[in-house]
């Protein structure tokens, strides 16, 4: 069987979480779950999930990812990942866990798009290495790069490094709290849409992407998301599961951890298919909605009626959402 052309690859850590709740049995071996470091551990799974939702077989095989697993990584989990029918490369370490995979000599090197969760310093280093490897492999075309800043570096002292790194990526996507923290604003200010717009514009004005043609996408919790670029005024999209009039969380929201990662995976697929940032954010919103309906990953069932995730069709949900926002 020939190797498929890869459209999307997410680069990040792969860790099984153990989640402990007061007065409850712990949840063990949660694939891409929450937990103390869940935002980092789940990133590659959630982003890949978001992309996979909108890449049905055989297009699912254009979704490429590599995971390094330790000797104790459950085979059941590996089988579940393989059931997604993607291009999954599993490197098992017999004596120690390893959390990063190398792109050398793999089909992932020719991907059309990459998602990174990195510090600004590592972002520039890894992107430079990626482009060098691609050039050596005869892949001179520049891929589409989405950068999600590592949350723990979103502090005022890292603002300038983040702005510098943003000049080398196509999409910069912090969440609202991370964006506010970068500029030294309080968490309360992060919930104000005007503040988020103003900060996103400041980032954009400093230069995002080659020739300043990049996009800032802020994932803003209960406010949804906002897309800002040089050619696009701030465009807000509501969350798929809005809070009630009393401010209470929607009943379908079980665990929001990782929804932002899934948003970005789906965003990339949407952008590759439509070349439109707002349309891509619709994909992202719907992709994120599947990630927050449970702890861990949604259930995939394939049958005569196609693929259902948690009993729902991703494309039907996308059509429903586009009607809501008037697209």
Question: Residue spans of the language-model regions?
Answer:
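Short, well-ordered alpha-helix to beta-strand connector turns
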Residues: 5, 110-112, 168-169, 200
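Conserved phosphate/ATP/ADP-binding segment of small-molecule kinases
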Residues: 134-144, 149-244
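Hydrophobic/aromatic residues located in beta-strands of well-ordered beta-sheets
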Residues: 8, 63-65, 114, 145, ...
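Substrate-binding N-lobe of the ribokinase-like
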Residues: 4-12, 16-95
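Short, electropositive alpha-helical surface patch
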Residues: 74-88, 131, 232-242
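Conserved phosphate-binding/catalytic loop of the ribokinase/pfkB sugar-kinase fold
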Residues: 83, 91-125
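Conserved post-catalytic alpha-helical subdomain immediately downstream of the catalytic base
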Residues: 45, 57, 212, 231, ...
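Short, conserved phosphate/pyrophosphate- and ester-handling motifs at nucleotide-, phospho-/glycolipid
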Residues: 42, 175, 260
């Amino acid at each position: 069987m020939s190797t498929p052309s890869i459209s999307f690859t997410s680069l990040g850590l792969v860790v099984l979480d153990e989640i402990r709740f007061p007065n409850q049995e712990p949840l063990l071996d949660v694939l891409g779950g929450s937990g103390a470091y869940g935002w980092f551990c789940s990133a590659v799974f959630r982003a890949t999930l978001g992309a996979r939702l909108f890449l049905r077989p055989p297009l699912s095989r254009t979704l490429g990812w590599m995971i390094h697993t330790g000797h104790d990584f459950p085979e059941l989990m590996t089988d579940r990942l393989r059931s997604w029918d993607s291009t999954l490369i599993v490197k098992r370490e017999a004596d120690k866990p390893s959390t990063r995979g190398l792109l050398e000599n793999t089909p992932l090197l020719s991907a059309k798009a990459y998602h990174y969760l990195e510090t600004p310093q590592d972002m520039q280093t890894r992107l430079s290495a990626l482009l060098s490897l691609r050039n050596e492999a005869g892949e001179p075309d520049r891929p589409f790069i989405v950068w999600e800043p590592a949350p723990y570096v979103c502090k005022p002292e890292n603002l300038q490094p983040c702005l510098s790194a943003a000049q080398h990526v196509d999409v910069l996507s912090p969440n609202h709290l991370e964006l506010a923290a970068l500029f030294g604003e309080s968490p309360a200010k992060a919930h104000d849409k005007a503040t988020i717009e103003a900060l996103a514009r400041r980032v954009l004005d400093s230069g995002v992407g080659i020739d300043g043609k990049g996009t800032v996408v802020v994932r803003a919790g209960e406010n949804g998301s906002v897309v800002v670029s040089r050619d696009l005024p701030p465009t807000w999209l509501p969350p798929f599961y809005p809070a009630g009039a009393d401010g209470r969380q929607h009943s379908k929201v079980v665990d929001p951890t990782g929804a932002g990662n899934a948003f970005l995976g789906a965003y990339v697929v949407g952008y590759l298919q439509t070349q439109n940032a707002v349309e891509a954010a619709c994909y992202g919103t719907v992709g994120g909605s599947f990630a927050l309906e449970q702890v861990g990953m949604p259930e995939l069932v394939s049958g005569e009626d196609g693929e259902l995730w948690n009993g729902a069709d991703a494309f039907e949900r996308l059509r429903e959402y586009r009607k809501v926002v008037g697209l």
